[in-house]
């Protein structure tokens, strides 16, 4: 396909299959967390553990996520990423079987560390998405990828509740094994895209792009951006670890964004585990009924996670370069305003509508924020940048542990209501990214020109 005079399109065109395959990994990761919350009562009764230790279970996997992120991020920039993900999902599926057979709580706690392998492989998924689809579709595709989490939540909260009520807490682990095996097979059949070709095509399209584009970087030549605050000279293919990570640490907007997302994601992490127990304890529901009501939140969240990218892209087409940031900040504040009374109320008639609306605004920032963090990183460093972000964002995984401690002191209803404002705090931190995002974006555009001008000059 021609991009212009004498220029041929480099990137292969992919359909929906790759994003569905990658979304399956998020589905399993999120769904298993939901089913773990359904199994919480059975685990406490069987192993005689406190609220603090049951809250520590979802937190334990972040240990491997932290330790594994850097080496997996490096591998994501060097090896076939689809096979890397398939191997991680194979380990995850094995761990599910071990969890189901756990004879003691210590055994269960230690084997759950293997669940973190999927979280450590997050950089590979983000890197793949950037190479499967055109730059201007990035926010939309990330939104579709993240929607896998909503499918997982529906399975983990709804279906797992029925299984746990029928067969006991171990069913919350057994149910994922067939899906894990199927995901491994799908990933092995998923093609590996060429690295950087989508960005190269964007570089050639820049001369003719108009404001119908929906990626911030692709609008760099049409928006009133400041000049880059730094000049790129790094050879990304042969640079050392120190040079690569040194370059990543210079991206100020990315770090404001990732810290803001980390703080905000603590509520998502906490709600993912304690949401079902909230309906059980405060509204006195069974596991299956609580899971059914929790799906109401999932409906709002499903619309939000898909809509976020479209809303930000629409604003971007109007020339608002900080659109991703504005959407994330505004929705974080609105979600907080909605969820505080939702948790404080003891009436389902009040809580359910607020959960539906709150779920929408809680996930609305997800795709714009992830796209923002990708926009400001040059293509050859995306895997390693995503690895660093995963390490920082894993801190949000301690939320179930913190809420468990607050629950023991004040009760679950108060604990969730008190913890919720942290979501707005994360949004306000992200606001500071707006100051440096345009300049960082201009740097990526300049680097795209530099990197692709060199091979063309040599032909």
Task: Name every feature range the model reports, one short phrase each.
Residues 67-105:
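Conserved MFS/SLC helix-loop-helix module at the cytosolic interface between two early adjacent transmembrane helices
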Residues 145-195:
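Helix-loop-helix hairpin linking two adjacent transmembrane segments in secondary transporters
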Residues 83-97, 322-339:
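Structural signature of the two symmetry-related core transmembrane helices
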Residues 36-37, 251-305, 366, 370:
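Extracytoplasmic gate region of multi-pass secondary transporters
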Residues 111-150:
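Cytoplasmic helix-loop-helix junction between adjacent transmembrane helices
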Residues 48, 80, 101-106, 284, ...:
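Helix-breaking motifs and short loop linkers at transmembrane-helix boundaries and internal kinks
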Residues 59-72, 295-308:
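Central cavity-lining transmembrane alpha-helices of secondary-active solute carriers
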Residues 3-12, 199-256, 282, 451-456:
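Juxtamembrane intracellular "pre-TM" segments in multi-pass secondary transporters
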């Amino acid at each position: 396909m021609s991009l212009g005079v004498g220029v041929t399109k480099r990137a292969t065109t992919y359909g929906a299959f790759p994003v569905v395959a990658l979304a399956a990994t998020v589905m399993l990761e999120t769904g298993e967390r939901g089913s773990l919350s359904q199994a919480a009562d059975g685990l406490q009764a069987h192993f005689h553990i406190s609220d603090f230790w049951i809250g520590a279970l979802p937190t334990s996997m972040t240990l491997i996520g932290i330790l594994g992120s850097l080496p997996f991020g490096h591998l994501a920039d060097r090896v076939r990423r689809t096979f890397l993900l398939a191997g991680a999902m194979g380990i995850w599926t094995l761990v599910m079987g071990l969890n189901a057979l756990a004879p003691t709580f210590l055994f269960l706690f230690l084997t759950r560390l293997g669940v973190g392998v999927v979280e450590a492989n997050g950089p590979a998924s983000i890197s793949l998405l950037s190479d499967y689809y055109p730059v201007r579709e990035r926010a939309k595709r990330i939104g579709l990828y993240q929607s896998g989490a909503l499918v997982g939540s529906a399975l983990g909260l709804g279906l797992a509740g029925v299984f746990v009520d029928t067969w006991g807490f171990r069913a919350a682990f057994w149910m994922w094994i067939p899906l894990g095996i199927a995901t491994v097979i799908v990933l092995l059949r998923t093609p590996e895209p060429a690295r950087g070709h989508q960005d190269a095509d964007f570089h050639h399209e820049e001369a003719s792009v108009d404001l119908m584009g929906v990626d911030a970087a692709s609008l760099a030549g049409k928006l009133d951006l400041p000049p880059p605050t730094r000049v790129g000279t790094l050879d990304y293919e042969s640079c050392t670890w120190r040079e690569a990570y040194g370059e990543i640490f210079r991206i100020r907007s990315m770090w404001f964004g990732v810290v803001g997302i980390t703080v905000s994601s603590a509520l998502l992490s906490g709600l993912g585990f304690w949401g079902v127990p909230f309906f059980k304890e405060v509204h006195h529901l069974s596991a299956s009924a609580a899971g059914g009501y929790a799906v109401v939140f999932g409906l709002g969240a499903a619309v939000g996670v898909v809509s976020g990218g479209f809303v930000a892209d629409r604003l971007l087409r109007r020339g608002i370069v900080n659109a991703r940031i504005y959407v994330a900040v505004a929705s974080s504040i609105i979600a907080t305003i909605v969820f505080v009374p939702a948790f404080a109320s003891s009436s389902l008639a009040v809580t359910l509508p607020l959960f539906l609306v709150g779920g929408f605004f809680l996930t609305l920032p997800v795709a714009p924020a992830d796209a923002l963090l990708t926009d400001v990183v040059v293509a050859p460093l995306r895997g390693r940048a995503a690895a660093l972000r995963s390490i920082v964002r894993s801190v949000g995984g301690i939320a179930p542990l913190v809420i468990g401690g607050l629950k023991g002191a004040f009760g679950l209803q108060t604990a969730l209501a008190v913890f919720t404002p942290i979501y707005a705090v994360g949004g306000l931190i992200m606001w500071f990214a707006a100051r440096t995002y345009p300049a960082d974006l201009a740097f990526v555009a300049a680097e795209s020109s530099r990197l692709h001008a060199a091979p063309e000059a040599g032909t």
